[in-house]
Amino acid sequence: MPRSLKKGPFVDQHLFVKVANENEKGTKNVIKTWSRRSMIIPDMLGHTIAVHDGRKHIPVFVTESMVGHKLGEFALTRTFRGHVKDDRKGKRR
């Protein structure tokens, strides 16, 4: 169920302060965060945010199409290495 519109988007306070400081200075430094639950807001456009995936920080460049999504959606936590090939035909001969 989506968040109520009257509440507005959720952004962790420490992340919001870091983005506001970068906007105020006019710089585009990488912002490191562990807050995967924070929603991407228009103030974050053009910034690179390093989102933690449980092991390392994945740099995510925020574009206009990402607004309204959560940061964790763009830093995958599981690595898929592919299925093992089933080689039954070779074993019969």
UniProtKB/Swiss-Prot annotation:
UniProt keywords, alphabetically: Ribonucleoprotein, Ribosomal protein, RNA-binding, rRNA-binding
Gene Ontology MF terms in the entry: rRNA binding; structural constituent of ribosome
CC annotations in GO: cytoplasm; small ribosomal subunit
Gene Ontology biological-process annotations: ribosomal small subunit assembly; translation
Pfam families listed in its UniProt record: Ribosomal_S19
Domain of life: Bacteria
PROSITE patterns tied to this protein: RIBOSOMAL_S19 (PS00323)
Family: Belongs to the universal ribosomal protein uS19 family.
Purpose of the protein: Protein S19 forms a complex with S13 that binds strongly to the 16S ribosomal RNA.
Protein name: Small ribosomal subunit protein uS19
Organism: Renibacterium salmoninarum (strain ATCC 33209 / DSM 20767 / JCM 11484 / NBRC 15589 / NCIMB 2235)
